[in-house]
A protein has these predicted regions:
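Surface-exposed acidic/polar loop and edge beta-strand patches at domain peripheries
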Residues: 1-181
């Protein structure tokens, strides 16, 4: 399945979201002079997020992070006496969901509107060695001058879950012209 871009708009904001990694790719708003600027650092084109170079970079620009955001020491944890060994992808640690975390998955569209979008993903039992099937829903909604992100996760086994997003906001676009976008 090919990733799709959805555009949310209201009077103050325009937000572009890719189904690849539930990634925020652009956030357009007016600066103090009334000029429309993109305040997210990201790749130039949506398809650049699929390039081998970007994937190998470990940048996570604007993407959802999961099943577990941050590091798990040595990729190990224990729940109810059962030991789990996750993939090691950051020195000796497990980072941001592993080698093929939620940032690399194509998400399904649950609902799409002009100012809101709901994406869903089902992470099967054993994916990246995590226990339990995990049903995830992330909702994006524009509210005046804000982007709201809501997360919902339900699992059928005990498991750690720590979802987050990884956007980089640039409030001075002139300072980094040509760096990413």
């Amino acid at each position: 399945m090919k990733p799709q871009i959805y555009i949310l708009k209201n009077t103050h904001l325009e937000v572009h979201i890719s189904t690849l990694g539930a990634t925020l790719t652009r956030m357009l708003t007016k600066d103090l002079q009334g000029k429309v600027v993109d305040v997210l650092l990201g790749m130039e084109k949506a398809e650049d997020y699929e390039s081998p170079e970007y994937i190998a970079s470990g940048a996570y620009l604007g993407a959802i992070i999961g099943r577990y955001g941050n590091r798990i020491a040595r990729g190990r944890f224990e729940i109810d006496g059962v030991k789990y060994q996750l993939a090691i992808n950051n020195g000796e640690n497990h980072l941001h969901g592993g080698l093929c975390g939620f940032d690399k998955k194509i998400w399904n569209v649950g609902q799409a509107g002009t100012d809101s979008l709901t994406l869903t993903y089902c992470s099967p039992d054993g994916e990246e060695a995590y226990p339990g099937t995990l049903q995830v829903k992330v909702g994006f909604s524009l509210q005046e001058k804000a982007l709201r992100i809501d997360y919902e996760a339900v699992t059928d086994k005990k498991c750690f879950v720590n979802l987050t997003h990884h956007p980089y906001f640039n409030l001075n676009p002139e300072a980094v012209k040509g760096y990413f976008t």
